[in-house]
Amino acid sequence: LMSATSTVPTANPTAQAFEIRPLPGSVGAEIIGLDLSRGVNDQDFARIHRAHLDHHVVVFRDQRITPEQQIAFSRRFGVLQIHVLKQFLLANHPEILIVSNIIENGQSIGLGDAGKFWHSDLSYKELPSLGSMLHAQELPSEGGDTLFADMHKAWDQLPEHLRKAVDGRHAAHSYTARYSETKFEGNWRPTLTPEQLAQVAEVVHPIVRTHPETGRKALFVSEGFTTRIIGLPEDESRDLLAQLYAHSVLPEN
């Protein structure tokens, strides 16, 4: 369970000695020797931010942080976005979404099937998120893995005929794209209220986005939230998206 103490990082944290080690494979790095509960000064955060830009996924080993500390560190990256499923937000800390398959008194305490499909978090919003910060509390001995794919690399290695097919095109993204499908497979998805549906109205984004800091291009489609390619017949859109999805999750990505 997550602690609810009021401890927060100090206003002027001291520098910490830590190491950034790339993980095996095409994405990810682990940070060894950093204690997030002590707070992170600007110089140390600059290194973390650079690691995130370079490796896309950053793992902080052996952390013992409170919800307040997690929120405070998350805010270093930008304004936090509140998830639409308010039923599963942590009490008194709406910035944190509970992801759990635990049932208490016949009710799910969290979103139990998050990440069933490949997706980019909050791509269904007008302003997609920079990323998400996951804080593991209780894990199974095996299974339950979270997988990542490098969409920069997916674009870099996209065959030329597919590059031409998506050049300048946009795609629609919707939170409800596969919501009913997952809802009927398990008791994890509550029925959305009209207010919640209004918060996740369909949006349109370029199929290829350019990172504002690095200038690198990346594919921006996913089977979880992308519904169609604007301006293409339904069958052509479905076929092209299927090819993009398959390419995006090749082992080398």
Where do the model's predicted regions map?
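Non-heme Fe(II) oxygenase catalytic core, chiefly the N-lobe of the double-stranded beta-helix
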Residues: 3-253
